């Protein structure tokens, strides 16, 4: 595990200087439709920023001291192996507990990813698909999300999952955070714990995945409950640091 220690800023401003052309075109179309009074459905185009203003501004009057340990790699935390995927939050929590660890809290993941510099991406302020496993072509799944273990027992589910899979081996790309934690952006979306929430909504997803998603340090997806098992979903574990 990696020791993460420092001062975390709870509220920040990260100003995007340049978005993808796809996102800009989508926003223009939506603005035109809105001006005509047309109803707008949720956009299917992710807000991907190519370049952020440097430095990030901390809005909090006081930073929060943090000290904890986090796995260097996505579960099973072994360099050179592809991370597990199609996992539910409950499965992730149980596996971390089985090795004397726990799921990372939202702010722990964020700080381990961005560091005290509050980087939008683990590696800096400009999006770079050569650093992390991101921006691969999106492939539409044909069936409802199925947990990995159950999917492996169904030949058609297994075949589809293999066709969707675009993971890379842990540590195979130079996708390191300021603390040396690997693959915190992209590869697989990672389950985290949301303190103060009640089941089945203690679950959050952070870091993004291999597809055309935000794949940044700060955002947290809260739309999926604890039994969701998206094909792009994995996790890593945290633990309290010894005094």
Please identify what each model-predicted range represents.
Residues 223-229:
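Short proline/glycine-enriched turn/loop segments at secondary-structure junctions
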Residues 80, 84, 173, 225:
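Conserved aromatic-histidine-acidic binding/catalytic patches
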Residues 59-61, 159, 227:
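Short secondary-structure boundary/capping segments
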Residues 1-97, 117-118, 124-127, 132-133, ...:
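Short, compositionally biased
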Residues 89-221:
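Functional-site microenvironments in short loops/helix caps that host divalent-cation chemistry
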């Amino acid at each position: 595990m990696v020791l993460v220690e420092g001062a975390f800023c709870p509220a920040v401003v990260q100003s995007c200087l340049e978005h993808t052309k796809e996102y800009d075109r989508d926003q223009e179309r939506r603005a035109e439709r809105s001006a005509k009074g047309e109803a707008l459905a949720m956009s299917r185009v992710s807000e991907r920023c190519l370049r952020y203003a440097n430095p990030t501004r901390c809005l909090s009057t006081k930073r929060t001291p943090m000290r904890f340990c986090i796995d260097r790699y996505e579960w099973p935390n072994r360099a050179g192996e592809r991370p597990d995927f199609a996992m539910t939050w409950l499965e992730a929590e149980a596996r971390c507990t089985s090795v004397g660890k726990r799921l990372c809290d939202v702010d722990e993941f964020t700080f381990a990813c961005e560091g005290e510099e509050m980087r939008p991406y683990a590696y800096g302020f400009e999006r770079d698909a050569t650093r992390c496993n991101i921006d691969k072509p999106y492939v539409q799944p044909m069936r409802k999300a199925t947990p990995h273990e159950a999917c492996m027992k169904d030949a058609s589910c297994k075949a589809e999952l293999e066709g969707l899979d675009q993971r890379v081996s842990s540590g195979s790309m130079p996708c390191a955070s300021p603390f040396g934690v690997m693959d915190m952006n992209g590869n697989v979306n990672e389950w985290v714990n949301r303190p103060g929430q009640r089941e089945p909504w203690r679950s959050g997803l952070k870091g993004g995945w291999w597809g055309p998603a935000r794949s940044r340090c700060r955002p947290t997806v809260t739309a999926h409950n604890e039994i969701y098992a998206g094909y792009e979903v994995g996790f890593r574990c945290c633990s309290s640091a010894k005094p």
